[in-house]
């Protein structure tokens, strides 16, 4: 704003507001636009989660100007005194607090605002209450701590930064202790006396249209607990998945619903009605179900028996479902829960799973008479504990047979391999006979053994023709071995030269096979050239004949 411009009337008490800020340091957390953005008391709080107050009121005895009017009553310009009321349960609502204050004879309540968790919108257990006179504030500080609100005595303090930080620390400790102890949120105990409040009236619940006394952030009650009562003469709507079972400890949430962080709260007492239940598929804005008409409804599979008095411990088993009901009470023997129908359980007769094993991944059930196979033991087909066969690739005949069985050969490939085996057999026999006649029995024996192993490793070794070749090579090998046993000196010499000659023979064999292939291709190429030459000669003769005829 430029200098020299006169201030309008709205800023007449700016200095007074600055004095209030100097006296009270809690204005650090004030957002000046929250009063404009946030809805009025008749519409409930703003839907977004806030970790602090919308507005912090001035201290005791200060007058408020037009710009700092309270959120609830915009026309009020008189004295306004703010107090903190803490040590409340997280399900305490504005209506509960209003009832307690009115019961003390204090009727000048200007504002009630609860502090909420930013993460889930749940109450932190303390609220700001604004009243219009010092007498009312003193009466609240003296008498309200003596009243019991949901099993706890409220704590009333002046509105300043010190007590605000104390309440914040207490709410954090409560949240952490509730999470460490693993206590689930079983839902607040609903009150039938508060069910008569009109929806959309002055009381501001955490959700618009919620039944007073209900959950500020309705979490699913466990499998136990019948639904709360309905107004007389009203037909109860049929829940999507059936009514809940008998009262019991809190259980897992229904599918598709998020459970807010658990907070430590007083357990359900026997003199209070059970908590309201939010069924799956029911939006948060709708009120919880009221009392059902007299008479138990038919049981619906999936959520246990119909509501009513708790069944005896020795009663009939409940119908099967994804969440079997627990016994009615925190004490009692734990029930063995069967796995859901869509998950395989451990096989019958098998030992129970170890604590670290996920039962969802057990093998499917097998016949109880057959031994169950373990991952560390032999397969059930081998009673002697031998390892299962494996594919050895190119290292032996069994692997080759398996390979042949897996990939059938074409006729051309089969004939090519058979021709190669025949060539190996004939050349090995001829060379072995020549080496044996020269007295080199070791080289002859090695040649025959090598040929036999090559034929056995081929892809067609299981064929009868290959077996005939192998038997002929083996007969030749036996004959040469019998001859070699009669000549000891020759055998000694052959042993000395065995190693060197074997290398030479293998090289010679490779070179000969290559030469044969080269000769074969050369011969083919020569034949092609001859055919081409003949075709050219024929074409030339035809051309000459044509030329001769044209003349």
From Swiss-Prot:
Outcome recorded upon mutating residue 87 to V: Abolishes interaction with NUDT21/CPSF5
A Gene Ontology BP annotation from the UniProt entry: mRNA alternative polyadenylation
Keyword field contains Nucleus: yes
GO cellular component: cytoplasm; interchromatin granule; membrane; mRNA cleavage and polyadenylation specificity factor complex; mRNA cleavage factor complex; nuclear speck; nucleoplasm; nucleus
Region of interest called Necessary for RNA-binding, as start-end residue ranges on this chain: 405-551
Biased composition (Low complexity): 207-219
Region feature (Microbial infection) Binds to HIV-1 capsid protein p24 (CA), mapped onto this chain: 358-551
Pfam families xref list: RRM_1 (PF00076)
UniProt PTM: Phosphorylated. Phosphorylated in the Arg/Ser-rich domain by SRPK1, in vitro.
InterPro entries with a match to the protein in the record: CPSF6/7, CPSF6_RRM, Nucleotide-bd_a/b_plait_sf, RBD_domain_sf, RRM_dom
Modification Phosphoserine, positions: 494, 500, 511, 513, 525
Domain RRM: 81-161
Cellular localisation: Nucleus; Nucleus, Nucleoplasm; Nucleus speckle; Cytoplasm
Region Necessary for interaction with SRSF3, SRSF7 and TRA2B/SFRS10: start-end pairs: 481-551
Sufficient for nuclear speckle localization: annotated segments: 404-551
Free-text comment on this protein's domains from its UniProt entry: Contains an Arg/Ser-rich domain composed of arginine-serine dipeptide repeats within the C-terminal region that is necessary and sufficient for activating mRNA 3'-processing and alternative polyadenylation (APA).
PANTHER family: CLEAVAGE AND POLYADENYLATION SPECIFIC FACTOR
UniProt similarity note: Belongs to the RRM CPSF6/7 family.
Quaternary context: Component of the cleavage factor Im (CFIm) complex which is a heterotetramer composed of two subunits of NUDT21/CPSF5 and two subunits of CPSF6 or CPSF7 or a heterodimer of CPSF6 and CPSF7. The cleavage factor Im (CFIm) complex associates with the CPSF and CSTF complexes to promote the assembly of the core mRNA 3'-processing machinery. Associates with the exon junction complex (EJC). Associates with the 80S ribosome particle. Interacts (via the RRM domain) with NUDT21/CPSF5; this interaction is direct and enhances binding to RNA.
Protein name: Cleavage and polyadenylation specificity factor subunit 6
